[in-house]
Amino acid sequence: MRPGGFLGAGQRLSRAMSRCVLEPRPPGKRWMVAGLGNPGLPGTRHSVGMAVLGQLARRLGVAESWTRDRHCAADLALAPLGDAQLVLLRPRRLMNANGRSVARAAELFGLTAEEVYLVHDELDKPLGRLALKLGGSARGHNGVRSCISCLNSNAMPRLRVGIGRPAHPEAVQAHVLGCFSPAEQELLPLLLDRATDLILDHIRERSQGPSLGP
């Protein structure tokens, strides 16, 4: 494909998505990366998945290419990654209903659950800790649970971004819905960079072969 081909497809997609007319599938693999969160609370711990998507878009040079799509109820951007194409998605529904946006976009782009990455916060890991989970249960995360329900599968690979768990169980809701502290905010740029590196490296490796290995 000529240089800029994927970016041109992204610009055409912004005009065509309102009619659900999609660009032809590129010759390489196509993957979706969905950042889970609450659209009205972008700076909170619970929406750190959306922050990772923002950094991913900047890294791939499509930070100004987000398009709001009413069919998916999400912001979408297309980005090239070698011969592959990434569909970046930020749901515009509340966390508990994120799966509806993810499943609709997967349907429109012809993606299986295994081709959909979820990026989300993880209470049981300290801030700065990252882990890639290849499918499995939701582990109590409502956004992941919604995706499993709407996709009828638990096979989605997930990038879990640690936000730490408060000492008192009754403080969990306030913790996840709260903003990062000033000290935590100093760690965020490096964390977002590392998360972006991890997911891009994993997608590159999978694009070169059929396995789902880490």
UniProtKB/Swiss-Prot annotation:
UniProt-annotated catalytic positions: H46 (proton acceptor)
EC number from the UniProt entry: 3.1.1.29
UniProt xrefs under PROSITE patterns: PEPT_TRNA_HYDROL_2
UniProt keyword Membrane, yes or no: no
RNA-binding found in the keyword field: yes
Family matches, as SUPFAM superfamilies: Peptidyl-tRNA hydrolase-like
Highest rank taxon of the organism: Eukaryota
InterPro entries, A to Z: Pept_tRNA_hydro, Pept_tRNA_hydro_CS, Pept_tRNA_hydro_sf
Amino-acid positions noted as binding tRNA in the UniProt annotation, renumbered to this chain: N96, N142
One Gene Ontology term from the biological process aspect of the record: rescue of stalled ribosome
Pfam families assigned: Pept_tRNA_hydro
GO (cellular component) term, any one: mitochondrion
Gene Ontology MF terms: peptidyl-tRNA hydrolase activity; RNA binding; tRNA binding
Annotated catalysed reactions: an N-acyl-L-alpha-aminoacyl-tRNA + H2O = an N-acyl-L-amino acid + a tRNA + H(+)
Site (Stabilizes the basic form of H active site to accept a proton): D121
Swiss-Prot/TrEMBL keywords: Hydrolase, RNA-binding, tRNA-binding
Disulfide bond residue pairs: none
PANTHER family attached to this UniProt entry: PEPTIDYL-TRNA HYDROLASE
Recorded family membership: Belongs to the PTH family.
Function as written in the Swiss-Prot or TrEMBL entry: Peptidyl-tRNA hydrolase that cleaves nascent chains-tRNAs that are not stably fixed in the P-site of 60S ribosome-nascent chain complexes. Acts downstream of the ribosome-associated quality control (RQC) pathway to release non-ubiquitinated nascent chains from 60S and 80S ribosome-nascent chain complexes. Does not act on ubiquitinated nascent chains, which are cleaved by ANKZF1 for degradation.
The protein's name: Peptidyl-tRNA hydrolase
Source organism: Homo sapiens
Gene giving rise to this polypeptide: PTRH1
